[in-house]
UniProtKB/Swiss-Prot annotation:
Protein name in UniProt: Flavodoxin
Function: Low-potential electron donor to a number of redox enzymes.
Keyword Flavoprotein: yes
Residues covered by the Flavodoxin-like domain: 4-145
Length: 148
């Protein structure tokens, strides 16, 4: 049984909802899923033992890309997670009326690539309420499963 880790940072609950929806889809497909709030993780060796790692973070800020507060310590310590060679994908929620719509997804993907991780699927970017985008989330989770 493949093992997947999902780590998310959520302030309003949107990214948490997205993470939960993805987790259900992966579990239904036979994955053993470990889903964690970024506020409760430590970076050291975090990714070890997982076949797939999914990172979710909402984007904040008008003038620059701001990651969700709980996710910042993990982002700053990604080099300690064991990312090299790991299969990863990213997701996030945001508001397309802002210049840096879901910019956190881009920032996390770029850092993971620089650390030698393999991005297996383009990042999922949800505009507004993820409940209205449930089909997109389910489809993305299906695509991620097929990419590994």
């Amino acid at each position: 049984m493949p093992k997947a880790l999902i780590v998310y940072g959520s302030t309003t609950g949107n990214t948490e909802y997205t993470a939960e929806t993805i987790a259900r889809e992966l579990a239904d497909a036979g994955y053993e899923v470990d889903s964690r709030d970024a506020a409760s993780v430590e970076a050291g060796g975090l990714f070890e033992g997982f076949d797939l790692v999914l990172l979710g973070c909402s984007t904040w800020g008008d003038d620059s890309i701001e990651l969700q507060d709980d996710f910042i310590p993990l982002f700053d310590s990604l080099e300690e997670t064991g990312a090299q060679g790991r299969k990863v994908a990213c997701f996030g929620c945001g508001d397309s009326s802002y210049e840096y719509f879901c910019g956190a997804v881009d920032a996390i993907e770029e850092k993971l690539k620089n650390l030698g991780a393999e991005i297996v699927q383009d990042g999922l970017r949800i505009d507004g309420d993820p409940r209205a985008a449930r089909d997109d989330i389910v489809g993305w989770a299906h695509d991620v499963r097929g990419a590994i």
